[in-house]
Amino acid sequence: MKCLHLAATALGLAALAGCVAPVGPVEVTRFHVPELSSLGRGAIAVEPAAGQDGQSLEYRSYAAAIARQLVLLGYSEAPAGTASPQFASLRIERRSFRADRPRSPVSVGVGGSTGSYGSGVGLGIGLDLSGPPPEQVETVLGVTIKHRASGKALWEGKASFAVRAASPLAQTQLGAAKLAEALFGGFPGASGETIQVK
């Protein structure tokens, strides 16, 4: 009976794993000033970068994910309507695309052989019937932490990943959390280094 229960559990986990879409790593690049003492302390506000719609649901989801990470780093969230000493300028870019096929959908092969009883030539044709590549969604998240009074950039980071359009992570809520965690993991990070976060 115990074996049957374990087998059923294993089958359930396998089925669940099949429902989770594969996700590539998040590419993260960060830059910061040499003096880091002002980072990770005091009040901070998340604000839309120029050209961003700060009232959209997408922006608010990403802003909330960024704010959570900043609080975990030691910042406090500035009350609405107050001018915090630092602010995080947030930019979001999303685009849909289809990857180019690396090869032709039709392939032709020719083979020949010679033996004691004669020779022969064979011709083979292969057709790729898998259809076009699935649509992908790329999301790029950019955050710049600035000193409000001087406008000086103290820290800047960019995180990006691409997933299938049908993946749950193509949706804003899940994608925002994943990108924000990757962007601020190991904060402030090595300046100028690009890393892959799985």
Each model region followed by its residue ranges:
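C-terminal/domain-edge helix-coil "capping" segments
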Residues: C19-L36, S130-K198
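Acidic helix-start/capping segments at beta-turn-to-alpha-helix junctions
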Residues: A78-A99, K198
